[in-house]
Amino acid sequence: MLAMDFAPQNRLGAAVSVAKDFVSRRPNDRFALVAFSEYALTQIPLTFDHQAMINSLEKLQVNEQASGTAIGMGLAKAVARTFQKVRQKSRIIILITDGVNNTGEIDPLTAAQMAKELGIKVYPIGVGSQGMVPFPYSDPIFGNRFINTFIELDMPTLNKIAEITNTGKAAMATDAKLLGSIMSQIDRLEKTQWTAKFSYNFSEQFMPFLWLAFGLLLLEILLKSFVMPLLPDQL
């Protein structure tokens, strides 16, 4: 995600920017963030706290010591840890990657099947142009510079994930503008209508007055039946 083919940002910076914009456009949604390279880690669990989500996005960094990309593990963790107990009708995962699954115990297609069984849609997005791309390199003599590096992007697997989870076909973003357009399209597709249900609790207040009226009526009957006949006529 450090490749600079999304200049002036690298791929990670571009992905973070569009993700923050996506969050800001959906004020009623909950979000979670799972980051993966060699390992998959939950950065923030499912939350309505959008500022916390944005803060987590801004803190994302590339682990340059990682020796692989675990797409399957990242997707599986998003499914199992984030959505397993969530019952909303619309549950989606936006899977953004620029590499090939080459490590991890769970295959991406197995993770996609897990998502399908729970009714979760996965929108895979491959970022970056395939082939030789400018990549930052710290040279001990010449300092920081860029070298052209070959980075492979496994679009066939991403397409299969989309097919399994019924989202059609994976998208490929070769620049920041196209990535933003793809996210906007997902935003339009996944609009959820919310139905508000209200429960009203009416407390009946007339019963004390009813009992009071009944008591007064009973008292009147008793007076007429037992007390009034005993009184002298002249009173």
Model segments located where?
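VWA/integrin I-like adhesion module and closely mimicked acidic/polar interface patches used
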Residues: 69, 92, 99-164
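Active-site-proximal beta-strand/loop segments in catalytic clefts of secreted hydrolases
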Residues: 34-37, 96-99, 125-128, 173-174
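Residue-level signature of catalytic and energy-coupling elements of molecular machines
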Residues: 15, 78, 122, 162, ...
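Juxtamembrane amphipathic/hinge helix adjacent to a transmembrane helix
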Residues: 172-206
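Membrane-embedded segments
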Residues: 1-89
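Sec/Tat-exported extracytoplasmic proteins
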Residues: 1, 22-30, 57-64, 78-86, ...
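Extracytoplasmic/secreted cell-surface and envelope-processing proteins
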Residues: 2-4, 42-43, 102-106, 131-135, ...
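C-terminal signal-anchor/stop-transfer transmembrane helix together with its immediate cytosolic
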Residues: 192-235
